[in-house]
Structures are given as C-alpha cells and as structure tokens.
C-alpha cells in the first residue's frame, strides 16, 4: 500500500509537467528550426570524419590480422571482422550516460538510445535501483525532464551527467489523483488531434475500485477529486469535438462512468449524484437531442429514486440542488404531456423518471420555501420563486391533459359496454400514478386540490375504472380517499380488498378444518381462534366429518352456516336492529358470559375471512356498529334506522320551540339515562351530577349527543374492540386497524357482505347458465325456468344455495360469481332427485317425463332441512 | 545690445553674492526674514528682465522660452524657501542657502543666447550637476513622508533634470556612474528598496510564497525583474515574465506603513495575494482546478523553483528571437562550441589529451545570474580520458552519508571521485566492461548559487524525508579543490535566503523562507507573516534550499 501510494505521488506531478511541456512547445520548435542550418554543416564535417575513421580502422584491422596469423587462432579473426563491420556504421545512436543518485552518493551508468523516451530512462533506472519510475525526477541542465519527450529532445549526449531527485507532495489519495491526471492528460492529447490508444475506461474502472467505504466524509473527499479535476467537462468537450474517434471514445467513457455509478452501494452512490448531475448539465448544453444525454438523464432519474441523504451530500446547497434538477423535471414532464396528448404512453420507465425527479423537488420546496404551504399566487420573493411559478403552470397543463385522457377512457369504456371487445389500452397503466403526482403538486398551491377534485368528479367513471384495473397491492393509495366522492362501489371495494393478503390456494399453505355439523360453532371457534394469523392468511381447507366432499363449495356452505349461528339472537352475541331485521350490532348483554369476548374476536376473523374469500354471508351491520369500526362519531341521523322511537324523541327535543321548551321545564328531563339490562333497571348519569342538571334549550344539544353516545356506543365498546382486533389479524401486516372500514361507506360493506339488494333476476340467472346433455330448446329446460319463476324468493335462494352454496348474488349480478352455472343431465332413472356439485356450480337433473314430477322434485330440495348435507345417500 | 544683456545679468549675480556674504556672519533670526524678502525682490527683478528682453528683441518665441524657464525657477525657489524656513535650527541650514544661490546662475545661464556664454555654461553645468543629486534625494524622501502633490511634481521635475544632464553629455554620465558606485559607502539606500510584505496563503500555497520571497532577496534577479517591468510583456506568450512583472509592480506601490530600520522592530507592508501567478500555477499543475483558492494539495518548492526558472529562461530567449542581431550571435555561439568539440575529437587518436564535449545554455539574462558550468571527467583503464562540460542552475547535494555534517562536507562529496560500474569504453564496439572512475568539478561559478539539499528520498519503506541537521555558514568560501582551475572569479559567497520545509514526512508539511535585507537584517516570511529573527535562528540546520550570492 505504501509503495502504491508513493508511486502515485510521482506520477501525478510527472503528468503535471507534461502539460507544462506542451506550453513550451513553441519555443523549443523554433530553436530546432534555428539549429537545422547547422545540421547541414555537421553532415559535411561528419563525412570528412568518416573517411579518416575508415582509413584508421583499415590499418587497425590489418594489424590484427597479422597478430592472429602469428598466433594461429581463428577466433581472433572472427572477432576482428565483427569489429570492422560494426565500426563501419555511419553514426551510432547508442548513449552511455551517468545518473547521480538522490542518496548514497553513488553514480550509475545507463546505456540508452538517443531516441529513447524519458519514460524508458526512468524504467532503466528503476531496474537498476528498485526506485519506482513514478517516484523519480530527473534534472539535466536545470530542466526537469518530461516523460514523453526523447533524450535527443533535451540534447542529451555521450557522458552526460543527470541528477535523480525525489519530491515532497501532499495529497490524501495519491493513486486517485494520478489516475485522474492520466485521464486528463489523455483527453488533452486526444483533443489536440493526436492518434493514441485511449486508456480512459481502464482508468475509470481503477478510480471506482478505490472508493473508500469508511465514512461519508471520506467518500465525499475521494469523489471530489473527480469533480475538482473537471473530468466531466473534459469528457463532454471531447464528445463535442469534430473527430468521430474522439466522440465515440468519450461516449463509451461517459456510459462506463454512469453504469459504475448505478452499480455502487447506496452510501457511495449518493455522493456520485453531484457528478452525474454535472454530466447532465453539460450534455444538456452541448447535445440535448442526442442519445447520450437521454441516457445520462435517465441515470440521474434512477439515482434520484434512491437518493436518501440530501443533507449529507448537499448540506447548505440543497436549494441549488433543487434549482439544478428542475430543468430536467420540466423536460421530462414536457415529454410526458406529449405522450399523453398523443395517447401513446407513457411507459412505466418514462413515468418513473418524472416521479423520481418530482420526489426530490417536492422535498426541496417543502424545506426551503419561506411561505407556508399551500402557497397563494402571486407570491412575493422567496427561494425557488421562478421554479414554483413554472411548476404551477405545469400543474395546469397536466390537469388539462389528464382531463382529456380521462374523457378518452370513458369513451372506450362506453364502446366496450356496447359490444366492442376492445380491451383497456396499456397506455392507461400510468394514468393513476400521474394523477397521484398531480395530487402531490396540488398540496403546494391553494385552491389546486379543488380543481383536481372537480376534474375527478367529472370523470368519475374513468377514475373508478382506472382504480379497479391498475391499483396494485403494496402501492400507496391513501391519496385516493381524499377524493372519495369521485370513486364508485367497485373502486372502493377494490381498494379495501387490497388490504387482505392474496389467497394462493396452495394446499400446502392452507389451514385445514374438520368440522362436526352437530358442534358447528364450538369446533369452528377452536379451529379459527386457535390458529395464528399467518396460518389463516394462506386460506382455509374445509371438510365436514363423515362426508366425502371438499373444495370451495363446502367452504362457502361453512361460511354461511357459521354466520347463521353467530348472528342468531338466541346465542346472545348480536342483536337485530329494531327497524331493519337484517342488520346486526353487538349485544350489550353478551358480557354475562366470560367467554363471549373471545367470540367477538372469532367473529371478526370469520367476517374478514369471508370477505377475503369473496363469499357473501348474508349478514348486514348496523350503521352504529359500522361507524364505530371506522372510528367515526355517531350523529343523530345515524340512529334513524337503528332506533326510530328514540330518533323521533330526540328530534322533537331539538326542534321544539325554545321558549315553549323552557316554559315546560325541559319536559322534566335531567342528564340521566334509564336502562334495563337482563331485567335490572338502572339510572345512569350522563355527566357528573347529571341528576341535578335540568335540560333546557341551551344544553339540549349536548344532552342529545351524550344520550346517543351512552345509549348506543358505550355499551358495546368492548365488543367492538374485540371484533376489530380479530378483523385486523386477517389483514396484511402493518395495516392500521380502522383503515379498512374508512375506505368504505356502509352501503359498500353491505354489498360485500350480502350482495345485491334486488330480488334475484331469473333472466340474469338464465343468461349465465350453460347446459350439458340438454339443449336449451329441450322441454325440460323450459319447464325448469318456468318452475323457478313461480317459486318464492326464499325458495329461489334455496335452489341457488343447493346449486352453488351461495345464497346471495353479488352486487353486479351473476357475472360477479367466480364461474358460470351449469345444468348437467343425469343418465339414470327419470324419477331421481336432483344432484349438485357446488364447487363447480353444477346442478344434475334427469330427463323428467312431466313438468309435475320436476316441480315436485325441485320443491323438495328447496326445503332447508333437506339441503344441508353432503353424500348421505 | 548684447553688452547691455551681459551687464544686466552680471550685476544681479554680484548683488546677490554680496548680500549673502554680508548676512552670513550674523546668523540671526531676523536675517532669515530678510532672506525671504530678498527672494521676493529677485522675482520682481526677473519679471523686469523679461519685459526688457521682449521689448528689445520683439520676438514671441524667445519670450515664451524665457517664460517656461522662469516658471520652473520660481517653483524651485518656493521649494528652497520652505525647507529653509522649517529647518531654522538645523546645522544644514547654512548649506541650503548656498545651494539656492548656486541654482540661480544655472537658470540665468540657460537664458543666455550668446555662444560665448554657452561655452562657459557647460563647465558650470558639470559642476552643478554633481551637486544637485543629494538635493533630489532629500526632496524625494521628504515627498515620500509628506505625500504632497506639489512636492511630488517638483520631485519628478528634479528627476527630469537629472535625466537631461545624463543625456546631454557623456562625460557627465561617467561622472554619475562613479557617483553611483560610491552610494553604498555614503550609506544612502537605492531607490528600489521594496518594503517587505507577506503573501497570503489561500490554501496549500506556501510553496509558491516561499519561493517568491527567496527570489526577492537575490538582487541581480530583482534588477532583471525591474528591467522586465519596463518592457511590454505579452501575457499570452510569456505568462511567467508577465506574472513577475506584475508582482514587482505590486511590490513597488508604497504601503501605508512607514519603514524603520531597527533591529528589533520591523513594520512590514500589507500582505497581498499573489494572484498574478495563477496562470503560472495552471501551467505547473494543469490537473488542479482551483489553483489560487482551496488548492487540494501541496507541491515541492524546489520543483516549482526549477519550473519557473525553466519557463523564464525559455520566455527570455523567445523575446530575444524577435531581434535579428541576437539570432546571429546565438547561432555563432552554437556553431563555435560544436566546432571546438569536433576538433578535439579529431585530434584525440593522435594525441593523448582528453576528448572534451561541451554543452552550454543558449544564454539569457536568467542563465547569466543563476547558471554555471560543471565539468565531469571519466577515466577508464586502457583508454583516453573523456571530459564533458554541461551547465547547471542548481547544485543538488547529497546529504545522506553520515560524514556529511555541513555544506562543506556536501560540496566535497559532490566533487569527490567515484567508481563507475558497467562502464564501456567504446559504445559502438563489443569490448567488455572496464573499471572507470568519474569526478565532477565546477568550471564556472554563478552569481547566485542555489544549493538544493536532497532531503526527500526513496528507501525500502517508500518515500521518505531526511530530518538530519546540515550546518551552513553565513559566508561561504569555496574550496579551490571544487574548481576545475583557478580563475579570476571570487570564491566568496554570502547567504541571502533559505527555504525550509517543516514536517516529518514527504506527504505533508509547510514551507517558510528566511531572507536577508540590504541592511543586513534577517526576516522570516511565513506566508502573510513577516517577523525579524536573529542569525542563530537563520542558521538552523533543517534548510531545504540555500541561496548564496557571490561577493
């Protein structure tokens, strides 16, 4: 490590000196031109000298021949001839020079060629002395030699004495500085038109390999080397040059840098963001229409998605950061608007970039703008003033464009209903996310949320359809409930169901239950309450004892039966509403049984599981119960259907003429409530000293509010809490308890629990039924539907239950069921009773000979006691 | 007519002389008042003379010429009268009136038209010119102190007069030169004595500040800079010369602080940022973005010194190339040197004398100051000796051996004979390696000798700094054994500056400069801080670069 660091020290400054050599090139070239005249003279002198040398060597060779002849040794002759041939060279380029060491007082002899580079000289010195080449400085005639020049360039001749010197240099990352120096030097030479092999990409990889990991401060200092050296500007300048080779080299280098940035761990990637932003700004000026700029901008967008340390990276420059990324956000939003207008997009990737820029911009605005949010336009001087004005215009454009898009969606949906089989366009997939961004913008400006609400209400059909189609589990949809008025039942139901885990129907994951019909409630209780929430999240596998059947049909029957037991008033768990017998609320008297609180938790789980499995159990909740589950306050109008007598009494109290009311001494009322519970009468004070407090025209509103709360909410507080806990167990993790019910209205929950309010439509039923073994024109089929129409609604539901284990039809009718219904032909005796496979919605009947016999058989299975068993025949 | 003119001027002169002699013995305050009255009278008489000359000649041109001369004369009188009145009790009071009386004939003579009078004027002019210099210097110092525009104008006129005297007669010029040589003995400081000012370090710039402060203590270099300052240096072609020119101009601006030549107290000028060197630094380190503020790293001071000397040398040669005469002489120097080399090579085989190769600077003003010549002789067994002469700007001294305790030891080691390994007698032949030895001696000394003590080195642990103490004297007498041959050059050098690196390793540290002023006082320049120090502190043994000036 020490060696590597020291090596970089020398290389850094040697690279620096290379630039200074470039500055002095003109002077040296001129001197070379001046000396060219002398070269001619030297040549003539050299020729004269050569002749003399040749004559001298001829004599010498003759003497050596004589010597060798006398001694009789042939080897001497060979050696002699070799010398002659080498002596005949016109001029030798070999040099012998002396290098004085930096320490130790020693001089070494170096053999070199005249046209060797100084770099090669450094390597020879390194070979002899083990001093790294990058660590060396060589001085001759007062000059420090530059590596890329030749020895001849410095007029180094035979027996020249050179001085080797070391240096001091302070830098925290010497290898990094050396790497950056090499990059800059290469770029400089390429920009001047030199044809050399580029090693910039290798240097970039080397630079990235050495990024420190200890602390944010060290990372920032290290990466600042890249910025302080102006490498981004140099690379962009190289990219903008006219030479195609330079352009392609710069392009690959920039792309390599960007890909390395994206691959870094997060804390290092955060500090690369300013450099990528610098690249974006430079490329936007130089070549805004080219592909490299788009690549760079996209990289910046993807890095902004995970950028979570703005204070560490930008510190007090956070406002500047906002100003700098705003042009890119504007650019991308412009592209988005174009795609929306042409109905050609945007794709997920395109939208993701806009979103990431917006998230960072929003943070900057929230932190740096002096005015409280929402902002009232026109505004006085503040930070990011121009950007905020521009953003408001973008908000207007986006709102208008999305309005057009939503109208287009509605037209497509209308065409689809008529009969056009066109499916939803893939270009609609990002509309919901775009609306979310528009909502985020509307938080900044006063009155903007109102504009968005108007637009969404106008396009309610489109908005709801988009929600049902594209709202996914795991995303954040909380913003949609700010515009609840713009959604319909299907959209709200979809959003509520997203809170449940997905049922996989994997047998390995299912929770198995084996239930004895005679002990339905107690055994179901143990199976459900005894299980962990995780086990139940995988779904239920239901089987009745002594019966062969399994599958979703059995499960649906179980849900219906167990709810019938739970909500049976005889079990004292729930009470029917006084006016609407279909609605239930917890029974205040249920606290008598010590085990009953657990049963409310059990009930919460069962209701949640039924909703999760999309089974209509036919039970409705009272409005008061629903409001408590949603965490909302109960008002006078809410008890209208629960207790009409009390509703009318309270209404009279509030609407009575004040003078008349007071003259009658408040009808003799005080702040007390008389209750009867299990035969025991009691008087409860609504507030401290309630008995002594008379009701008058001024406090009668308070009296009514306290009365309602004490009468309806307080008695079942514990039961509601237990139910809510059980219900929440079935939701996905980290979901707030009341969020499910907050997403719905009471009518929505009614539709999910009981299905449609209307009587069963026989025509709808028939339209969703297919036949096997029968033709639609057969007389038995005609008889079947005629008989069904003559039955009562209760008998029809019994037939449906026998057929599918569903007693109630979903809100949207039979198309809401998981599959079509089927009538199969039994090839057995013609007088047999019908059979059914509820799992597959299959009813099997023989070919009855007469309509009378068919009617008799169908009415038989419509009786309740007959239809409640499997496989007993 | 002409006789009348002579009569009028002569009578005034005699009258003035008589009144002066009459007043001198008494030396009473009342007499000084009489002097003022006398001067007024003289003025009125001159006006009368002007009128008479106009009336007699009838030419406007002559009248105008007389008018300008008289106005200058009147201002001189005002200047003379004020110091006389202010220095009533001064001993020099007696001298000033004499000078005043002598000055009047000068102007009277200048008014003369007859040739006979002009001949006598020349001799008088020579005498007067010699004496006017002290007056000008005194006025200059006074004007510096009082900063009065009137005095500044008068001082500039004095300078103009001096210049006229220079250009008018070559003999008077020679007299002036001799007088300049005598100035040090008279202990009068020269005009260009800069106030010491600190240099602000805006971030890792102490190597620049230390180098500049050291160079300012080399008076031949400062003279070169002053010469450069007068020229119009193109900044694009010669960034280093332009930077130094601007640097000298910045130093030449008088600062608000006054100078007191006191050993214990020094009032330095306001420190400033050497921003004019930003271009030079950019050339020195092209990779560093912020060269002047927030510079990310330190540099080697000796490396920077070599760099700027190299750059200045090249830029000065470039300026010379604009003149054809210099080009001719340049080519002749190159050819003559090579001719000598060739002759020696051809004689070699026939004789036993050494073969000598010579490399030399193309001479520039910079190499004349800092440049010298080294001669190295290689003696190999079985072959003739080989000598090589090459120039140097700095001497790089090895201080690592234990035997080196001071500069003398380092110089001795520098010129000691050493054995060579791997030496080949004939590069072109295939003869084997023979034993050889090599020695280096100084053939020509430089006016400023820069000694670079090589403290930074590379060892088994990597890059290192040698913290060893090396003693160096205030006066250095070079040993003759370090020289090739005896010469008329002086072997005496005196220390003028040192650059010191403070720190324990080569990766960090700080640079300071100790520099000697002309009055012999030593100052320590630590970036913006300037403090006086004693010679004991100067002679600490941790110096990195030493600057010695030839005496």
Curated annotation (Swiss-Prot), chain A:
Gene3D superfamilies: Hect, E3 ligase catalytic domain (3.30.2410.10), Hect, E3 ligase catalytic domains (3.90.1750.10), Phosphatidylinositol 3-kinase Catalytic Subunit, Chain A, domain 1 (3.10.20.90)
Predominant location category: cytoplasm
Ubiquitin-like domain segment(s): 95-171
Its EC number(s): 2.3.2.26
Induction context: By jasmonate. Down-regulated by hydrogen peroxide.
Pfam families per record: HECT, ubiquitin
Catalytic machinery residues: 839 (glycyl thioester intermediate)
Region (Disordered), start-end ranges: 1-37, 70-90
Residue span(s) of domain HECT: 532-873
Disrupted-gene phenotype: Accelerated senescence.
Metabolic or biological pathway, per its Swiss-Prot or TrEMBL entry: Protein modification; protein ubiquitination
Cell compartment(s), UniProt: Cytoplasm
Gene Ontology cellular-component annotations: cytoplasm
Keyword terms: Cytoplasm, Lectin, Transferase, Ubl conjugation pathway
Biological process according to GO: leaf senescence; protein ubiquitination; response to hydrogen peroxide; response to jasmonic acid
Annotated ranges, domain C-type lectin: 272-296
Catalytic reactions of this protein: S-ubiquitinyl-[E2 ubiquitin-conjugating enzyme]-L-cysteine + [acceptor protein]-L-lysine = [E2 ubiquitin-conjugating enzyme]-L-cysteine + N(6)-ubiquitinyl-[acceptor protein]-L-lysine
Compositionally biased residues, Polar residues: 1-19
Family according to the record: Belongs to the UPL family.
Entry function: E3 ubiquitin protein ligase that regulates leaf senescence through ubiquitination and subsequent degradation of WRKY53.
Official protein name in the record: E3 ubiquitin-protein ligase UPL5
Organism of provenance: Arabidopsis thaliana (Mouse-ear cress)
Gene responsible for this protein: UPL5
Curated annotation (Swiss-Prot), chain B:
Compositional bias ranges of the Polar residues kind: 329-338
InterPro entries in the record: Papain-like_cys_pep_sf, Peptidase_C19, Peptidase_C19_UCH, USP_CS, USP_dom
Organism: Arabidopsis thaliana (Mouse-ear cress)
Residue numbers spanned by region Disordered: 51-104, 163-188, 329-349
Domain of life where this protein originates: Eukaryota
Official protein name in the record: Ubiquitin carboxyl-terminal hydrolase 24
Signal peptide: none
UniProt key word Transferase: no
Gene that produces this protein: UBP24
């Amino acid at each position: 490590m020490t060696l590597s660091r020291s090596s970089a020290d020398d290389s850094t400054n040697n690279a620096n000196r290379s630039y200074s050599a470039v500055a002095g090139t003109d002077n040296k070239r001129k001197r070379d031109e001046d000396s060219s005249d002398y070269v001619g003279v030297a040549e003539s002198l050299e020729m004269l000298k050569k002749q003399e040398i040749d004559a001298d060597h001829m004599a010498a060779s003759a003497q050596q021949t004589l010597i060798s002849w006398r001694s009789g040794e042939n080897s001497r002759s060979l050696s002699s001839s070799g010398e002659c041939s080498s002596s005949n060279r016109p001029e030798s380029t070999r040099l012998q020079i002396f290098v004085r060491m930096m320490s130790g007082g020693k001089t070494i002899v170096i053999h070199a060629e005249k046209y060797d580079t100084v770099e090669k000289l450094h390597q020879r010195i390194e070979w002899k002395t083990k001093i790294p080449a990058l660590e060396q400085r060589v001085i001759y005639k007062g000059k420090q030699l530059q590596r890329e020049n030749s020895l001849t360039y410095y007029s180094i001749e035979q027996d020249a004495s050179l001085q080797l010197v070391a240096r001091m240099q302070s830098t925290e990352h010497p290898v990094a500085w050396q790497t950056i120096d090499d990059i800059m030097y290469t770029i400089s030479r390429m920009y001047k038109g030199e044809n050399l092999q580029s090693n910039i990409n290798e240097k970039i990889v080397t630079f990235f390999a050495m990024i420190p990991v200890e602390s944010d401060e060290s990372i920032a200092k290290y990466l600042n080397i890249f910025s302080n050296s102006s490498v981004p500007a140099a690379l962009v300048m190289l990219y903008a040059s006219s030479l195609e080779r330079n352009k392609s080299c710069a392009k690959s280098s920039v792309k390599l840098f960007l890909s390395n940035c994206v691959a870094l761990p997060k804390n290092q990637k955060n500090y690369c963001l300013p450099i990528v932003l610098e690249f974006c700004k430079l490329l936007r000026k130089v070549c805004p229409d080219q592909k490299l700029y788009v690549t760079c901008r996209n990289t910046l967008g993807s890095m902004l998605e995970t950028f979570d340390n703005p204070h560490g990276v930008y510190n007090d420059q956070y406002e500047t950061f906002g100003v700098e990324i705003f042009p890119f956000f504007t650019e991308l939003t412009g592209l988005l608007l174009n795609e929306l207008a042409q109905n050609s997009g945007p794709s997920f990737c395109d939208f993701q970039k806009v979103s990431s820029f917006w998230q960072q911009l929003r943070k900057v605005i929230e932190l740096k703008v002096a005015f409280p949010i929402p902002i009232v336009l026109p505004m006085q001087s503040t930070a990011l003033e121009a950007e905020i004005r521009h953003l408001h215009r973008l908000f207007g454009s986006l709102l208008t464009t999305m309005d057009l898009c939503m109208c287009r969606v509605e037209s497509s949906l209308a065409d689809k209903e008529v009969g056009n089989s066109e499916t939803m366009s893939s270009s609609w997939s990002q509309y919901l996310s775009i609306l979310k961004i528009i909502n985020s913008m509307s938080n900044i400006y006063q009155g903007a949320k109102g504009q968005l609400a108007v637009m969404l209400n106008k396009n309610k059909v489109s908005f709801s359809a988009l929600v049902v189609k594209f709202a996914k589990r795991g995303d954040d949809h909380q913003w949609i409930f700010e515009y609840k008025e713009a959604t319909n039942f299907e959209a709200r139901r979809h959003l509520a169901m997203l809170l449940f885990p997905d049922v996989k129907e994997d047998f390995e994951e299912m929770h198995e239950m084996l239930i004895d019909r005679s002990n339905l409630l107690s055994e179901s209780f143990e199976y459900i309450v005894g299980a962990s929430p995780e086990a139940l999240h995988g779904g239920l596998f239901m089987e009745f004892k002594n019966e062969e059947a399994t599958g979703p049909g059995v499960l649906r029957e179980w849900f219906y039966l167990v709810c019938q037991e739970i909500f049976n008033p005889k079990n004292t768990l729930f009470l029917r509403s006084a006016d609407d017998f279909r609605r239930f609320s917890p029974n205040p008297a249920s606290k008598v049984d010590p085990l009953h609180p657990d049963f409310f938790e059990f009930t919460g789980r069962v209701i949640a599981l039924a909703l999760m499995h999309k089974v209509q159990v036919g039970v409705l909740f009272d409005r008061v119960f629903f409001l408590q589950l949603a965490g909302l306050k109960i008002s006078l109008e809410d008890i209208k259907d629960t207790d009409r007598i009390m509703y009318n009494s309270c209404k009279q109290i509030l609407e009575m003429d004040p003078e008349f009311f007071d003259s009658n001494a408040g009808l003799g009322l005080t702040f007390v409530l008389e209750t009867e519970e299990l035969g025991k009468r009691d008087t409860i004070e609504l507030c401290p000293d309630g008995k002594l407090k008379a009701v008058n025209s001024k406090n009668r509103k308070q009296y009514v509010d306290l009365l309602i709360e004490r009468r309806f909410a307080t008695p079942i507080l514990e039961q509601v809490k237990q139910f809510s806990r059980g219900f929440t167990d079935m939701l996905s993790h980290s979901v707030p308890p009341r969020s499910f019910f907050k997403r719905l209205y009471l009518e929505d929950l009614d539709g999910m629990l009981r299905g449609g309010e209307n009587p069963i439509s026989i025509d709808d039923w028939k339209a969703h039924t297919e036949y096997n073994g029968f033709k639609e024109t057969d007389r038995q089929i005609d008889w079947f539907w005629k008989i069904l129409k003559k039955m009562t609604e209760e008998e029809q539901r019994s037939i449906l239950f026998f057929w599918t284990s569903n007693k109630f039809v979903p809100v949207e009718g039979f198309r809401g069921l998981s599959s079509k219904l089927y009538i199969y032909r039994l090839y057995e005796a013609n007088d047999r009773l019908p059979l059914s496979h509820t799992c597959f919605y299959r009813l099997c009947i023989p070919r009855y000979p007469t309509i009378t016999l068919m009617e008799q058989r169908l009415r038989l299975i419509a009786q309740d006691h007959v239809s409640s068993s499997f496989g007993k025949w | 007519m002409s006789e009348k003119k002579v009569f009028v001027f002569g009578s005034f002169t005699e009258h003035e002389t008589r009144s002066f002699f009459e007043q001198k013995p008494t030396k009473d305050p009342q007499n000084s008042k009489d002097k003022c009255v006398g001067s007024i009278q003289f003025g009125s008489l001159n006006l009368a003379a002007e009128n008479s000359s106009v009336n007699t000649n009838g030419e406007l041109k002559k009248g105008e010429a007389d008018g300008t001369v008289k106005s200058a004369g009147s201002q001189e009188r005002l200047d003379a009268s004020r110091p006389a009145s202010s220095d009533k009790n001064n001993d020099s009071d007696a001298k000033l009136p004499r000078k005043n009386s002598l000055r009047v004939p000068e102007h009277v003579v200048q008014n003369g038209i007859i040739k006979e009078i002009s001949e006598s004027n020349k001799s008088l002019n020579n005498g007067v010119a010699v004496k006017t210099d002290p007056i000008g210097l005194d006025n200059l110092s006074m004007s510096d102190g009082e900063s009065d525009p009137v005095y500044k104008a008068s001082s500039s006129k004095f300078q103009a007069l001096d210049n006229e005297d220079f250009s008018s007669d070559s003999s008077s010029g020679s007299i002036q030169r001799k007088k300049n040589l005598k100035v040090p003995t008279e202990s009068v400081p020269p005009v260009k004595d800069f106030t010491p000012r600190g240099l602000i370090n805006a971030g890792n710039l102490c190597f620049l500040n230390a180098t500049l402060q050291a160079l300012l203590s080399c008076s031949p270099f400062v003279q070169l800079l002053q010469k450069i300052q007068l020229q119009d240096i193109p900044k694009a072609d010669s960034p280093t010369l332009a930077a130094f020119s601007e640097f000298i101009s910045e130093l030449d601006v008088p600062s608000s602080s006054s100078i007191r030549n006191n050993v214990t107290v020094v009032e330095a000028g306001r420190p400033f940022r050497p921003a004019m060197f930003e271009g030079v630094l950019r050339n020195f380190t092209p990779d560093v973005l912020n060269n002047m503020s927030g510079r990310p790293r330190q540099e080697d001071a000796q490396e920077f010194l070599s760099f700027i000397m190299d750059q200045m040398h090249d830029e000065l040669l470039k300026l010379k190339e604009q003149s054809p005469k210099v080009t001719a002489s340049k080519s002749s120097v190159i050819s003559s040197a090579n001719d000598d080399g060739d002759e020696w090579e051809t004689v070699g085989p026939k004789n036993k004398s050494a073969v000598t190769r010579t490399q030399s600077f193309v001479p520039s003003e910079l190499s004349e100051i800092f440049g010298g010549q080294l001669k190295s002789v290689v003696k190999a067994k079985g072959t003739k000796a080989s000598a090589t002469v090459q120039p140097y700007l700095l001497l790089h001294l090895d201080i690592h051996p234990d035997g080196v305790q001071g500069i003398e030891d380092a110089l001795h080691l520098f010129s000691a004979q050493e054995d060579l390994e791997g030496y080949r007698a004939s590069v072109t032949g295939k003869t084997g390696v023979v034993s050889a030895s090599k020695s280096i001696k100084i053939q020509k000394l430089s006016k400023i000798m820069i000694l670079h003590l090589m403290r930074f080195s590379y060892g088994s642990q990597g890059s290192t700094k040698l913290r060893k103490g090396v003693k160096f004297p205030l006066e250095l007498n070079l040993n003759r054994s370090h020289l090739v041959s005896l010469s008329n050059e002086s072997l005496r050098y005196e220390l003028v500056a040192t650059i010191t690196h403070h720190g324990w390793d080569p990766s960090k540290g700080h640079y300071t400069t100790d520099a000697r002023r002309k009055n012999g006082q030593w100052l320590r320049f630590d970036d913006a801080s300037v403090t006086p120090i004693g010679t004991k502190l100067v002679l600490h043994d941790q110096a990195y670069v030493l600057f010695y000036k030839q005496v």
